[in-house]
Amino acid sequence: MAQTIVKDPNILGGEPVFRGTRVPFKVLIEYLEGGDTLDQFLEQYPSVNRELAIAAIEEAKVSLVSKLR
């Protein structure tokens, strides 16, 4: 599975972003924390498609769970 969240020092100073975009992954988390829906996020950031957003959430979940073990 290709990484959906990438870090590149040439893109936003290495901030984790959605692959192929300049949209920081943390923006999605902030939307969800604030009570917004995935659809609201996607409307504001059309360069991120639904499949990419869901895959990134899954990737982050797997990473977090593995760190907790």
Which sequence ranges carry the predicted segments?
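A short, structured beta-strand/loop element
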Residues: 1-36
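Long, charge-rich, low-complexity alpha-helical segments
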Residues: 25-27, 32-69
